[in-house]
Every structure is written in C-alpha cells, then in structure tokens.
Regions:
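Extended alpha-helical interface modules used as scaffolds for assembling large macromolecular complexes
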Residues: 259, 264-478, 482-484, 495, ...
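Substrate-engagement module of ASCE P-loop NTPases
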Residues: 135-137, 166-188, 488
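Flexible phosphate/Mg2+-sensing switch loops adjacent to catalytic phosphate-binding sites
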Residues: 53-80, 125, 437-439
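Amphipathic alpha-helical segments of the small helical/lid subdomains adjacent to P-loop NTPase cores
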Residues: 200-206, 211-267, 300-301
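Pre-Walker A adenine-sensing motif
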Residues: 16-26
Length: 521
C-alpha cells in the first residue's frame, strides 16, 4: 500500500460509496467484479482507494474519516483487515523486457512478497500463485482481496500474441476459476477498458459480475463524475456549469449523466474549455476504426457528428481488438473506449459532448473522406441559406441532401424528418453546440435549438427550429410563436432566427419559413 496516501491529497469527489458496495458483497458469489471504463475515468483511482481501505499494510482511518464510507456501520469492521494483492498489468508489461515472460514476472513478484510476509509458511518451493494463496488460507485462515488494474491490457496490446494470451488466460483461470479460489478470495476486483472477452477469457472469468459502459448497474455513479458532483464542483471553482455540461457531459450510465473526470478536473483547475482528451490519447487511436470498410459505418459517424443517435447491436462484439467484423463491432468498441456514449434503453450510440466531437472531427478530417467533403459542402450551402433567411433555398437543399446522401431514412413521421434535418445541418457543428432536441419551453417543446459557440456568437444567430410532417411551414412557424418557444432561451443575448420546416408527402416537397425574432423591449 506504499504511496496510497497520495490518493486523497486532492479529494475532488467522494467515491467511497464503491467501498460500501464491495463491503456488501465480501465473501459471496457477488464478490467477483469486473468494472470496465474508458481511459481517464478514474479506474486506477478507484482501485487504489479499495487497496487503501482494505490493506493491512495501510493505516487509513484518518484518510477516510468524514467521507461517506466512514458513516457506515461496517466501516471499521473491514478497514485495514485484509491482505491485498494489487496487480497493475500495465506496469508489469512496461517493465518486462520480453512480453512472453510477463505472466511469469507477475507470478514471481507476488510470490516473492508473500514469502517476505509469511516466511514460516513457505517451507518448500511453490511456483503457482493459486497454490500459495491456498496454503496461506489453510495455515492462517486469512482470505485475500485481489485487485487487478488494467486487467485487459494483454488482451488489447498483445492481441496478436497467442502464446502470451494463453499464458495469461491460464493465469486468470487458476486464480479465479473453480471451487478452490472461493476458499482464499474475499473479493476480486478487476478493472480495465474492455469487458471479459467472449471467447477465450470468458471461460476463465464467467463467474464475474460485469459493470460496463453498456450496462453499469449498481456501480454507475462510482466511476466518473455524476451531474450533481460536477455542478457542486462548478460552484466551488466558479465555473459556468452549463458550459461545463455542454463540453464534457453525455455518458449515460443507468440513470446517471456521467462526466469524464480527467476533463472536469482539468477545466476546474485551469479554467480552459478545450479537449483534455487529446492530452492523454491521440485521435490516431480511433482513426483506423472509423476508416474500416464496413457498410454503413461512415454514414453512422456522419450522422452522430451531426448530433443524431444511431442504432447499434452491441451483442456481436467479441470484446477484443482482433475480431472486429462489422459496423456494430466498431461502434461498440468505440463505446468502450469512450468515443461514443450509449443509451441502453433505446440501444443507440451517440457522440457524448463537444470534447469528443472535436476529437472525432479531427480523426475524420485526417483521412479526407470524399463522402464527408461533398456532404459538408451541401450542408454549408444549407446553413448559408438559413442564415440568409432564404426559405426556398433551405427547402431545396434539405431535399437534395435527403435524396443524395441520406435517402436510407424514409419519411414516415415527424421523427424521420427530424433525423434528416439533424444530419443535413452537420456543417453547423463547427459554429454551434450540439443541437438541443425537444427543449422545454413556455408551452411545449421546441424540436431543435442551435446555440452558437461563444466565439461565433457575433456572426451566427441562435436557431429555433420547428418541424411539421405532412403540414405546411406556416403551421410550424405559428406553433413557434403561439407556444412562445423563444422564451426557452430568453437569457440568450444574441440574435435568434425562427425556422419552420415542413414536408408534404403528397407533393414530396420541403417548405421553409424563416423570421428574425424581435425581443420584447
């Protein structure tokens, strides 16, 4: 537990509710946890916190006093009471000269520490870690808490090395599989980016409960920052919460809006609204993924860049980086990497926030997609026509974009019209934040509201857009006025355009009316 006191030197947010959960499952069949999250989400922080709380080698009561866990009845019952084996696979991989020997290095390192702690127990040579843990349990009655950080790094970084994977899977199987491990394991906590691999590692770890970016269940609020936590931080550090939300919000885990902690801490300390993602990860990591030649992949990326949600079947992804065979596999992997958010109720993927939108835009532009370049040109013409208040041209451009680029979306109702419109205004993403869908107003919900980024506010008005399917544009405009939609952004000080768009299924024409909103003096 050396150095674990550093964990709480800058305690931004209390995440000790995770300890409350792990205490509740100790020494049960639910005590096998695999908690996967993207980089920069505080996975190692959580692992260090658990080690600091449980480890006999730590004296951490003062560290946890005043935090949520200290108020629980069983706080002292488990505090610093266990032998904790804390393995950082990334560290071992980085410090192993030959990756083929990394599993041996892990085993030898842990065995060496066990011999130091229990010199009288190991009177003969023990070469397998599970055997050593069983001996300690038999001689002392002591069970272990095993924490493995970056558990999946050998699955990701050594994906093509079958020898290493086989050795590692056998190591995991020996540690966790069967009845013998239940005799020496009090808690097993694995954390990484990927969930358990569906083919090879599943047989070794199928007794683990999984908490992922697809389904975080009870652990949703404990990795990443919740909206309430970020709002509290924004007040404490005098930051504009709405702006923080636009830039860094967007991950949906269970019923929580989750923020990337790395980005939130960065903006609180530095006061700069920018992509902190690029400081610790290059867009080059995602570029090969979005350029894979799978039907519908580039279209899906373009749709999401424009603010739309895209259906994704997450069941086909094998949870490794080698067996990617479809658009859905790519999108699911991007969800686990944090480049996409996921709504488990609608089973759709989306770009979560402005920070990630910038990263993906750079990744797309780095390869100069022909599809993207041509589409952007048409979208720019649509935006220019909107700003020029040329309703006829807007109708013509929407029709052209629908017919030539996104005809796969057939008009059946207002929802399908809104999907086409969101994609058609893709070029607006350079100047505007992600459109707000169905923004609550005085007497209803506006279909779309586009708010310009601060640096473009002088030249680009806010847009309030109402859609009508199989009605006329005048009806859409009248609804904007009757239901007082502009009151939803009445504190916005720039210009506002009201945009009514309709589609007539009989004549198959788009109509558009645009008016400038005159604020009441």
């Amino acid at each position: 537990s050396r150095g674990l006191g550093d964990v709480y030197k800058r305690q931004y947010v209390d995440k000790t509710g995770l300890i409350e959960y792990t205490n509740s499952v100790l020494d049960t069949t639910d005590a096998y946890i695999c908690n996967s999250r993207p980089r920069r989400f505080g996975k190692s922080y959580a692992a260090n916190m658990l080690a600091a709380y449980y480890s006999k080698g730590a004296d951490s009561e003062k560290m946890f006093s005043g935090l949520q866990i200290s108020k629980e009845a069983d706080f002292r019952e488990h505090l610093n009471k266990y032998d904790v084996i804390h393995i950082d696979i990334q560290w071992f991989l980085a410090n192993c000269e030959d990756v083929d020997n990394v599993v041996t290095l892990i085993t030898d390192s842990v065995l060496s520490e066990l011999r130091e702690i229990y010199p009288d127990i190991f009177t003969w040579e023990v070469s397998r870690l599970p055997d050593a843990l069983s001996i300690v349990r038999e001689k002392t009655g002591q069970k272990f808490i095993i924490i493995i950080d970056e558990w999946d790094v050998l699955i990701r970084d050594a994906a093509t090395n079958g020898k290493v994977q086989e050795a590692y899977i056998n190591f995991l199987r020996g540690m966790f599989k069967g009845t013998e491990p239940t005799k020496y394991i009090q808690l097993a906590y694995l954390t990484g980016i990927l969930p358990v691999k569906k083919e090879k590692t599943q047989s070794a770890l199928n007794n683990f409960d999984e908490f992922t970016m697809l389904s975080a269940s009870n652990l949703a609020p404990y990795i990443g920052f919740t909206e309430d936590e970020v709002e509290k931080l924004s007040k404490e550090y005098h930051q504009d919460f709405d702006k923080v939300k636009r830039w860094y919000d967007g991950y949906l885990l269970k019923d929580y809006q989750i923020y990337n902690p790395r980005a939130v801490v960065g903006v609180m300390l530095k006061g700069e609204f920018k992509s902190y993602w690029s400081e610790t990860a290059s867009y080059e990591a995602v570029t090969p993924l979005i350029n894979m030649n799978y039907d519908g992949l580039k279209t899906a990326i373009i749709e999401m860049l424009s603010g739309a949600n895209v259906k994704v079947d997450t069941a086909t992804f094998k949870n490794d980086t080698v067996n990617i065979h479809s658009k859905d596999d790519v999108l699911t992997y991007m969800i686990h990497l944090g480049y996409l958010g996921y709504d488990q109720y609608t089973k759709t993927a989306f770009i979560p926030n402005e920070e990630i939108r910038q990263e993906l835009t750079v990744a797309v532009e780095s390869r100069s997609w022909n599809e993207m370049l041509m589409f952007q040109q048409e979208s720019e013409r649509l935006l220019d026509a909107t700003l020029d208040m040329d309703g006829v041209m807007v109708g013509t451009q929407i029709e052209k974009i629908h017919n030539e680029y996104i005809s796969v979306i057939q008009y059946h109702n207002e929802n399908s019209l809104s999907s086409v419109l969101a994609i058609a205004y893709l070029s607006a993403m350079q100047y505007y934040f992600k459109p707000i869908r169905e923004l609550p107003t005085g007497r209803g919900f506006a279909d779309f509201v586009y708010i310009p980024k601060p640096e473009y506010k002088a030249d680009y008005p806010a847009l309030i857009v109402e859609l009508k399917w199989n009605q006329n544009a005048q009806t859409a405009m009248q609804q904007i006025k009757n239901k007082k939609y502009p009151t939803a952004i009445e504190n916005y000080t720039g210009d506002i355009l009201l945009v009514g768009i309709s589609y007539d299924k009989n004549c198959k024409e788009h109509q558009c009316l645009i008016e400038k909103y005159e604020k009441e003096s």
